[in-house]
Amino acid sequence: METDYLTIKEAGQHELEIKKSRFIADVGRVITEEEAQAFIAGVIAREPKATHHCWAYVLGEHDEIQRESDNGEPSGTAGVPILTVLKRNDLHNAITVVTRYFGGIKLGAGGLIRAYSNATSTGVEATGVVRLVRQRELTLTVSYPLYDRLAHYLTENAISVLDTAYTDAVAVTIAVDLDAVTPTQDAITNLLSNQFTVKEGPVAYHEVPVEIHASNR
């Protein structure tokens, strides 16, 4: 992808009980269809006695790949609600498998839609969401007497420090949003009276935590 996007923080699981049926949401981050199918297969292997394994995933820079399955539930009552929650929360390269153990009470079409939607949204919220931001890595090398001043500036401005190496000087590798590279370098130049060196590194995605109250509406 060439843009920043929201996705699942890490693989996680959350369970709900609705009218004696257990709904277990497994949420994860996937990049390819092969990874998505392997994720689904892993859940099925872990829960072989479940009544249903319903799932959905979205992949690609523009969500070009969207798949869902009701896995035996009435058409449109499981896979589509799961997919809808992922899309309404603007999640990309994300998957959810909701495993159901039938508890003996039928929920009806509307009840199933609400159950699978709620299982997905609470699973996403419990697992967590991050924004993947394209940032430039910069390695700043300063003398020991100036290091504390630099470290304070980075902390005060919430700039992510990826690595710090201590040799005859201190080399600090930071990650900066692409549109902030020049302003950041200018600010540090003024702060340290140009008594440092900078080496530009690659552009890479870095995770920024996001607070989310997942929506299923």
Regions found by a protein language model. Name each.
Residues 128-146:
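Short glycine-/aliphatic-rich beta-strand segments at the starts of folded cytosolic domains
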Residues 141-159:
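Short amphipathic alpha-helix segments
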Residues 174-183:
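Terminal, non-globular segments
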Residues 47-50, 157-162, 189-197:
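A common structural junction motif
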Residues 150-156, 183-192:
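Short amphipathic alpha-helices in soluble, non-transmembrane regions
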Residues 1-76, 197-209, 213-217:
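C-terminal regulatory domains involved in ligand/effector binding and gene-expression control
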Residues 78-127:
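Active-site beta-strand/loop microenvironment that shapes enzyme catalytic pockets
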